[in-house]
């Protein structure tokens, strides 16, 4: 199985071409064809030597993904189900925001973090995506825009799809460098957010990278007992370790951290828990932000339900009175398989039923 050429940063592409007797400008031409003209095959690169095109074809594919399902919401949200070369399925979501077009990408096939409310973890991690497979998600959404010929572009990226990004650290960092490259897609670092469930040692590594990419932490509980019961990762990285890493990140980068907090009815949404959350974030208040997220119910996790609006607002009021920067997240795609992992799970179930029916 040939790797995608999207797996290479521009410097890596230059080094690869030079090793094969090409001038540096040849790699720059290839890069422009990929990310500015956004061709889907090497044969479309008309200023590349005909002798070199077969070498490219022997070494790489361009886009390794195949589109399986597309769902479009009334609010303009688009959910894609892509098939990888090995037949595995991943999800990508396009969200139309007032500030631009944001794409949520997947970094792993399945997830081992084990959050008890999440559709992503219904299927255990089968493998990491390589950086080319992550970049390809952006490229296919951008192709959707290019085909419409309305001058639209992917302006923001959130690494919050299926999988734990920091459990696939090397490939995610390569992906970030590719999409941020000023000579390519040029998606600004401050328009990119990486979300982690709380791998404290990787938060420290990320702080040391010197990138301007935003960091979000999936918190979802204000104390260790509750967080360990709904997020298995907390048993390895309890709040003390997590917040030590977050404080290091803030000190090192002087950048704000966003805390994601899914509102689960009568689980983590009481007034007492709101005060606990305010107290937990007190020392980093100036450089932190809490995002309260309405829960998208998952049939396999029917022990959880969405917090009623009045409980969300009461929780929000406690945070605001304590000086916490917070917002209730606007919902997208509520009329399609909105929860991360739902579309993939449903499609895999249908595929299994088809196989069973033909036996």
Curated annotation (Swiss-Prot):
SUPFAM superfamilies named among the record's database cross-references: Radical SAM enzymes (SSF102114)
Keyword Repeat: no
Entry note: cofactor: Binds 1 [4Fe-4S] cluster. The cluster is coordinated with 3 cysteines and an exchangeable S-adenosyl-L-methionine.
One term of GO molecular function: tRNA (adenine(37)-C2)-methyltransferase activity
The protein's Enzyme Commission number: 2.1.1.192
InterPro entries, per the entry: Aldolase_TIM, Methyltransferase_A, RlmN_N, RNA_MTrfase_RlmN, rRNA_lsu_MTrfase_RlmN/Cfr, rSAM
PROSITE patterns for the chain: RADICAL_SAM
Enzyme class: transferase
Catalyzed chemical reaction(s): adenosine(2503) in 23S rRNA + 2 reduced [2Fe-2S]-[ferredoxin] + 2 S-adenosyl-L-methionine = 2-methyladenosine(2503) in 23S rRNA + 5'-deoxyadenosine + L-methionine + 2 oxidized [2Fe-2S]-[ferredoxin] + S-adenosyl-L-homocysteine; adenosine(37) in tRNA + 2 reduced [2Fe-2S]-[ferredoxin] + 2 S-adenosyl-L-methionine = 2-methyladenosine(37) in tRNA + 5'-deoxyadenosine + L-methionine + 2 oxidized [2Fe-2S]-[ferredoxin] + S-adenosyl-L-homocysteine
Catalytic residues, chain numbering: 91 (proton acceptor), 340 (s-methylcysteine intermediate)
Function: Specifically methylates position 2 of adenine 2503 in 23S rRNA and position 2 of adenine 37 in tRNAs.
NCBIfam families referenced in this protein's UniProt entry, alphabetically: rRNA_mod_RlmN
Miscellaneous field: Reaction proceeds by a ping-pong mechanism involving intermediate methylation of a conserved cysteine residue.
Listed name of the protein: Probable dual-specificity RNA methyltransferase RlmN
């Amino acid at each position: 199985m040939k790797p995608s050429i999207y797996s290479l940063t521009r410097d890596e592409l230059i080094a690869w071409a030079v090793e094969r007797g090409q001038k540096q400008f040849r790699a720059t031409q290839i890069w422009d064809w990929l990310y500015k003209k956004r061709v889907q095959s090497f044969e479309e690169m008309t200023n590349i030597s005909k002798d070199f095109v077969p070498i490219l074809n022997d070494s790489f594919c361009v886009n390794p993904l195949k589109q399986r399902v597309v769902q479009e919401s009334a609010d303009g949200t688009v959910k894609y189900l892509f098939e990888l070369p090995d037949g595995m399925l991943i999800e990508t979501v396009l969200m139309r925001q007032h500030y631009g077009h944001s794409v949520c990408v997947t970094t792993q096939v399945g997830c081992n973090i084990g959050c008890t409310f999440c559709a992503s973890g219904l299927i255990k991690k089968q493998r990491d995506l390589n950086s080319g497979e992550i970049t390809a998600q952006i490229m296919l959404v951008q192709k959707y825009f290019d085909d419409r010929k309305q001058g639209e572009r992917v302006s923001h990226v959130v690494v919050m799809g299926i999988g734990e990004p920091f459990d696939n650290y090397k490939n995610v960092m390569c992906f970030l460098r590719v999409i941020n490259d000023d000579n390519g897609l040029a998606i600004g670092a401050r328009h990119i957010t990486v979300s982690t469930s709380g791998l404290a040692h990787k938060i420290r590594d990320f702080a040391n990278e010197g990138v301007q990419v935003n960091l979000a932490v999936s918190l979802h509980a204000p104390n260790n007992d509750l967080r360990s019961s709904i997020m298995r990762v907390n048993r390895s990285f309890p709040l003390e370790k997590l917040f030590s890493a977050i404080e290091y990140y803030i000190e090192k980068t002087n950048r704000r951290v966003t805390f994601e907090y899914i509102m689960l009815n009568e689980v983590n949404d009481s007034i007492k828990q709101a005060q606990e959350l305010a107290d937990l974030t007190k020392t980093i208040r100036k450089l932190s932000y809490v995002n309260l997220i309405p829960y998208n119910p998952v049939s396999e996790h029917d022990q959880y339900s969405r917090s009623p609006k009045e409980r969300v607002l009461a929780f929000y009021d406690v945070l605001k009175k304590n000086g916490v920067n917070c917002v209730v997240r606007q919902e997208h795609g509520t009329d399609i398989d909105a929860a991360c992992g739902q579309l993939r799970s449903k499609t895999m179930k249908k595929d299994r039923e088809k196989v069973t029916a033909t036996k």
